[in-house]
Amino acid sequence: MKIEMKKITKSFGANRVLEGVDFTVESGEVHALMGENGAGKSTLMNILTGLYQANSGEILVDGQPTTYSGPMEAEQHGISFIHQEMNNFLEMSVVDNMFLNKELRTKFGLMDNKAMREQAAHYLSLLGAKLDVEQPIGNLSVGRQQMVEIAKSLMTDAKIIIMDEPTAALTETEIDQLFGVVRRLKEKGVGFIYISHRMEEIFEIADKVTVMRDGLSITEYATKDVTMKQLVKDMVGREIDDFYPDRTPDHGPVAMEVKGLTENGVFKDVSFTVHQGEILGFSGLMGAGRTEIMRAIFGIDKYQSGEILLDGKPVKIRDPQDAIRHNIGFLTENRKDEGLILEDSLHDNIVLPSIDGFVKHGLVDDKATDEFVRMLMKRLTVKAMGPDVSAGSLSGGNQQKVVLAKWIGSGSKVLILDEPTRGVDVGAKREIYDLMNELTDRHVAIIMISSDLPEVLGMSDRIAVVYEGKITGILDGKTATQESIMTLATGGVEEHAGAI
């Protein structure tokens, strides 16, 4: 199958989203689609699969002009779209999710459960996934759920599979497994459209890459013929000479010290310090316990023993309100469920942790909060029509800036950032890195959890590595390497691991 999208345009009201986009993909290749959030990637794919209709342009499938009335018709013709946010019914079984609205029936019109179980197991086995198909799909890891989505695509005889940020929540092992499946299916003639912000993945898995910017298809390359620097330039419209900004850390006294923090079965004897003006990276494999440690420090989860000191004084943090009172902020890895109230305005989200400071005589000073929010939005260059728009209407990068604004506005002296640039485009990443440097210049202590090793190495002054709930070593950011981090992250011993 060969799909050619030619001169595709699309407007929503007065907003022109696509401006004459060209894109081609064929069976047996992986074609990456890159661009900043808002570049038009999702809109283009939604036009291909029939969710939207283009205003002009044409789609050719094997040379024939084609349009689909919706995703179901596109799927029937061999085009499958696996979205970043998988729409599984978590309490239903794997097999029931796979055959939802496509149930097999006996000649008597009854549900053929045996045939559905056998087919589900068969298509999963083609991917090397041996699963109990009668268990609830919610029991599976995100990586396993993704395998189920790919198996569903194969059931519909997909010739082209669209994958949107497929590795965003996967472990390194699951990413390796996913890439193995993609390569095997490619050899069997399946084509992939691979949407991702992760540069290193593009060079590992893609044969071609198309870059979009501001609703235009800017360039197409064979991956072997292009550099990361060129792709970044094409995406943002300018050169970013140094992807990670230079840091000239000026560390002050210890802002926070953690001693012997323990929660049985989750983490054990965790001890570390972070100084004013420092970025302390936390690295480790997914499931190592990094997020759980920070949730305990912030008062979301309980711990059995250990001590937290701020500015040298022991503090009791029983819940997040205690943490906020002690000037600790926490940007969670799941900003949509925990960091923001998506249906609420930017104003209400940003002012939430600081609202007590704006109450006079029992009433909120609306004028003061409005000025406060506008100042923070300007300072963090939040791209939005104004403070009254909903948080859910913003791109991922701007949502992340709103969460940062919330904690900066609350006067956080210790700021925990859990996967601060996950799902964020390359231009917004650089803006977030610059903000982190600006905060440390103001003596804020930052703890950054990241699964992106280049990010950890590029931004951290020191790097704490966690393995099975324990800190196995702390490395100097200047001398650490991916190899030294992975040695500690897999339980090995690194001779240059320094003091806690």
UniProtKB/Swiss-Prot annotation:
Residues 3-239, 246-493 form the ABC transporter domain. One of its GO terms (cellular component) is plasma membrane. InterPro entries: AAA+_ATPase, ABC_carbohydrate_import_ATPase, ABC_transporter-like_ATP-bd, ABC_transporter-like_CS, P-loop_NTPase. ATP binds at residues 35-42. CDD domains: ABC_Carb_Monos_I, ABC_Carb_Monos_II. The keyword Transferase does not apply. Its EC number is 7.5.2.7. The keyword Repeat applies. It catalyses: D-ribose(out) + ATP + H2O = D-ribose(in) + ADP + phosphate + H(+). GO terms for molecular function: ABC-type D-ribose transporter activity; ATP binding; ATP hydrolysis activity. Pfam families: ABC_tran. It is an enzyme of class 7 (translocase). It is found in: Cell membrane. It comes from the Bacteria. It is a peripheral membrane protein. Keywords: ATP-binding, Cell membrane, Membrane, Nucleotide-binding, Repeat, Sugar transport, Translocase, Transport. The complex is composed of an ATP-binding protein (RbsA), two transmembrane proteins (RbsC) and a solute-binding protein (RbsB). Belongs to the ABC transporter superfamily. Ribose importer (TC 3.A.1.2.1) family. Part of the ABC transporter complex RbsABC involved in ribose import. Responsible for energy coupling to the transport system. This is Ribose import ATP-binding protein RbsA. It comes from Lacticaseibacillus paracasei (strain ATCC 334 / BCRC 17002 / CCUG 31169 / CIP 107868 / KCTC 3260 / NRRL B-441).
